[in-house]
């Protein structure tokens, strides 16, 4: 069985059809936090063929829960309403977490068939078939895409949602304050905070206010991470790319870290008993074995002095270092060596720990939260390049 595909739909007449479809009122106990305004899609068929005379696009058929949108789709087919549709595909990444990796957008979409399936001992679902005039397919991780427009002369009549009737942030028009926030992220990403602030000032309006919302003495590092991810979406919608810098907080001071992966995770609070067992295993054997193995690598021998290497060979951490979980045990992190990094305490380990604590604050056991997450790259952090740069 495939992972759930999340669908957003906006109608030219009805506005946001998918709004509220992922809530408990719409789907009962199948509701999902973070996907309240999306439709849960279980299967999708996109039929394209070519007989030698050009490609033929036969529309898309998908299966979804019967939910809040069901009567609205009947309205759409009855009134021949033009729709704008977006399908977000998820998969399990190398960290064992869900990541958005594929996207299909349809414009000029019209419903051609609806079939309800109410069968004993099965989910109540409906299968919907749609035709379309424009399709965009993007692999968000591999950065490939395809688009097709059936009738180029009709492009301007294709319905495109605006900020008044579209709940999905992907299509909202940026106001000047939002532009300021993106400029702040650009300053972090490019290591030129003052230069980007100057640009915000020159734009006028509320741009500088938006900039200062992000980069001020009260800024939380996770807000910068979020803004940086938004920055990468400007040229490639919903692509989560590798970001090489992250602004964290330590004792009220901003710290710029390099060599960071920022990913989107679904943070799920782990039961305290399970957490205690994993922490006990880590303290008893895992940390020691990780350090012994790491001490045998050329990376460690080229970095630490003889005294620190001896400590590592005995399973002890070097002075001013700690072993850090990239994905925390409090969430879905494991004790696998791939999830561990030997990290310098000041300021690096404390910055990452502060970020994780901010995200986890207020989340109860079993609750979930979709959030950006900063991960130090490699097995030893910071990267050797950063150390060399700081000594120049």
Swiss-Prot record:
Gene: yhhZ
Family designation: Belongs to the hcp1 family.
Entries under Pfam families matching the protein: T6SS_HCP
Lineage: Bacteria, Pseudomonadati, Pseudomonadota, Gammaproteobacteria, Enterobacterales
InterPro entries membership: Hcp1-lik_sf, His-Me_finger_sf, HNH_nuc, T6SS_Hcp, T6SS_Hcp1_domain
Organism: Escherichia coli (strain K12)
Name of the protein in its database record: Uncharacterized protein YhhZ
Cysteine disulfide links: none
